[in-house]
Amino acid sequence: MAFRHLAVARLKSLLVLCAVLLLVHAMIYKIPSLYENLTIGSSTLIADVDAMEAVLGNTASTSDDLLDTWNSTFSPISEVNQTSFMEDIRPILFPDNQTLQFCNQTPPHLVGPIRVFLDEPDFKTLEKIYPDTHAGGHGMPKDCVARHRVAIIVPYRDREAHLRIMLHNLHSLLAKQQLDYAIFIVEQVANQTFNRGKLMNVGYDVASRLYPWQCFIFHDVDLLPEDDRNLYTCPIQPRHMSVAIDKFNYKLPYSAIFGGISALTKDHLKKINGFSNDFWGWGGEDDDLATRTSMAGLKVSRYPTQIARYKMIKHSTEATNPVNKCRYKIMGQTKRRWTRDGLSNLKYKLVNLELKPLYTRAVVDLLEKDCRRELRRDFPTCF
């Protein structure tokens, strides 16, 4: 009889151990999608559908959780920097409290329209406002396991006031949405023509080496969200987030626009080969992105205009970001060149990587002279 009780006890212990191992395996290799069983019938959401239902129905995480290794011209980021991020994830993937649950499918504290902060607190003040943010601008919920791991990629140069305003607004929003996130500021070195698309590719490459992100949101520094229901999460299809901007009277300037803020999974970025590296100066890279998205068999999705709303910070034209006079010639060749222009041929030099309290700062040399020399082969009259 005693032997029988002992056998039953051992069997129960074995079953509990198996359950724990299955849970850990699931959390590492396939954290459940927010709404992986939901689908949408159209790539563009219709305005007369209930706004929040439309958001939820178009939210999913379909990419795997494993880090990818892209070929680049710089060595893998040091173990010290990787460890700084990975230490944060250990208690999430292997919690001491095995009863820790995933966060609610709908974040519980969303209110809809929110205050947009236009003041410019200094960095020390911002650190006091957001004390729970980890090194590198890495935030995550404390009382539940985040359902999404999101890297915010911001191309940047010489706009510190805008950066502080954006950080103030984004950290407030992203914490409320219960995301596991970090903000990456990808800063181009001085004395080069600004290249937004290539900075996006570099941001993706650097961020992917630090942490197993599922979703990448490419975000202009001068756009501030006006509604907290605009979820910064992984889309089923690539998503144009900045649908309604005050500068354009909250209307799309044209139907094919894919600029401002875009959200793509790792799988999407692989399929479209990232952004073009060849648009030096203002204009062209966002329309090129729309074309390569279509060529890869994907569609651009949007949330309803009453949710996907943004305020744009006013700014003057920058001397280092002149209008790209060759943009139309390059865009005319996108269908021919997109598979060999992007992540697949990305070349840059990582000058500095710094985990600041509110963001990760990556300073990069985009090797403009070398790239322009190569471009002359395809566009001899432009470069």
Curated annotation (Swiss-Prot):
Residues 30-383 are extracellular. It comes from the Eukaryota. Mn(2+) binds at D222, H315. Its cofactor is Mn(2+). Residues 1-6 are cytoplasmic. Pathway: Protein modification; protein glycosylation. Its EC number is 2.4.1.-. GO terms for cellular component: Golgi apparatus; membrane. It is found in: Membrane. Disruption phenotype: Worms exhibit resistance to the Cry5B toxin produced by Bacillus thuringiensis. This is thought to be due to mutants having reduced population of glycolipids which are targeted by the Cry5B protein. The keyword tRNA processing does not apply. Disulfide bonds join C103-C144, C215-C234. InterPro entries: Galactosyl_T, Galactosyl_T_C, Galactosyl_T_N, Nucleotide-diphossugar_trans. Glycans are attached at N37, N71, N81, N97, N191. Changing G260R: In ye43; resistant to Bacillus thuringiensis crystal5B toxin. The keyword Disulfide bond applies. It is an enzyme of class 2 (transferase). PANTHER family: BETA-1,4-GALACTOSYLTRANSFERASE, BETA-1,4-N-ACETYLGALACTOSAMINYLTRANSFERASE. This is Beta-1,4-N-acetylgalactosaminyltransferase bre-4. The lineage of its organism: Eukaryota, Metazoa, Ecdysozoa, Nematoda, Chromadorea.
